[in-house]
A protein has these predicted regions:
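A short, proline-enriched helix->beta-strand linker immediately N-terminal to the Walker B motif
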Residues: 171-175
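Conserved ABC ATPase signature
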Residues: 151-156, 160
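Conserved ABC ATPase "signature" region
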Residues: 75-76, 128-147, 256-257
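Conserved ABC transporter NBD signature motif
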Residues: 64-76
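Charged, flexible cofactor/metal-binding loops and thiol motifs
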Residues: 239-333
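P-loop NTP-binding/switch modules centered on Walker-like glycine-rich loops
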Residues: 57, 178-182, 186, 190-269
């Protein structure tokens, strides 16, 4: 079995609007290995969630997906029909959404929804499916699992609903899980529990995990590798250690300056921020998308598109015309 669970090349998502074409995701390349956690991080509106929906082929009707390569465990799923993708979703790859209350059907019990998933993808009797659903609820830390199977989503707390979503996603033991901001709607204590649970289950089932988030604290806890998105593009990617200890792209560095560091950030000191606004992605765009907000911008930055470059290693790459040496001098200054 291949260690490479997900392999994506040149993913773009365009959305036709009355004012033009919105280039929401542009030229995204990703890969995830078995047992690895890839965190996709960036500001709201940068294209993180659209990227995850594009991988699952769940984009809105008007959105146009183009992609050169989409492989799951070495097998191409590019060009699959909706019927074929429905066999993949929930079976070989699963998704955990940000707000479980909008993902679970309020008209059906937890048990009915979990059993339906199993009967769709596995040749099981109703009794066997119910037993497996109960077992999975217990595995994700839900007590009184038999009782929970008979309850409706509104009868559970936010944390319990998210655990139910995780249990449903794991029912068929998928090779890949995509989690889109799975802890945003939860308080800090429950958030930590859910992250720990995801990591433990990932290790147990030997899955690949793509975690979409804007919370760098979450990234620091769970990531193996990190992809930083800005205005629809990946502007930097590398191991979690590289991104946190030696960020290269000016946008990534700006994000890191926004994080208060215990023991280093003085009480009352202003928090870091990135000045300016994200550019409009409607119509054609030439040059670096971060140019208007970057301290190192030159005319060259606006004249031509910038590709990811990896001058220092095969594991870290950044989208900037400036050399590592120049970026280092600017950081010191």
């Amino acid at each position: 079995m291949s260690d490479r669970v997900l392999d994506v090349e040149n993913l773009t998502v365009d959305i036709p609007l009355a004012t033009g074409i919105l280039h929401a995701v542009d030229g995204v390349n990703l890969h995830v290995d078995r047992g690895e956690t890839l965190c996709i991080v960036g500001e709201s509106g940068c294209g993180k969630s659209l990227t995850s929906l594009a991988l699952m082929d769940l984009l809105p009707t008007k959105a146009i997906r183009k992609i050169e390569k989409l492989e799951l465990s070495g097998a191409s799923i590019l060009g699959y029909s909706e019927r074929e993708m429905s066999d993949v979703r929930g079976n070989k790859m699963g998704m955990i959404f940000q707000e479980p209350m909008t993902s679970l059907n309020p008209a059906f019990t937890i048990g009915n929804q979990m059993i339906e998933t199993l009967l769709r993808h596995r040749n099981l009797s109703n009794d066997a499916a119910r037993d497996l659903a109960k077992l999975m609820l217990e595995k994700v830390g839900i007590t009184a699992a038999e009782q929970r199977l008979g309850q409706y989503p509104h009868q559970l707390s936010g944390g319990l609903r998210q655990r139910v979503m995780i249990a449903m996603t794991l029912l068929c033991e998928p090779e890949l899980i995509i989690a889109d901001e799975p802890t945003t709607a939860l308080d800090v204590t429950i958030q930590a529990q859910i992250l720990l649970l995801l990591k433990e289950l990932q290790n147990e089932f030997d899955m690949g995990l793509v975690l979409i988030t804007h919370d760098l604290g979450v990234v620091a806890r769970i990531a193996t590798r990190v992809a930083v998105m800005y205005a629809g593009q990946i502007v930097e990617q590398g191991t979690a250690k590289q991104i946190f200890e030696n960020p290269l792209h000016p946008y990534t560095r700006g994000l890191m300056r926004c994080i208060p560091v215990p023991g280093k950030t003085k009480r009352g000191a202003p928090l870091g921020s990135i000045p300016g606004m994200v550019p409009s992605l409607i119509g054609d765009f030439t040059g670096c998308r971060f140019a208007d907000r970057c301290e190192l911008t030159s005319d060259v930055c606006r004249q031509s598109d910038v590709s990811l470059r990896d001058p220092n290693s095969k594991t870290q790459a950044y989208r900037c015309i400036h050399s590592i040496e120049m970026l280092a001098k600017a950081e010191v200054a």
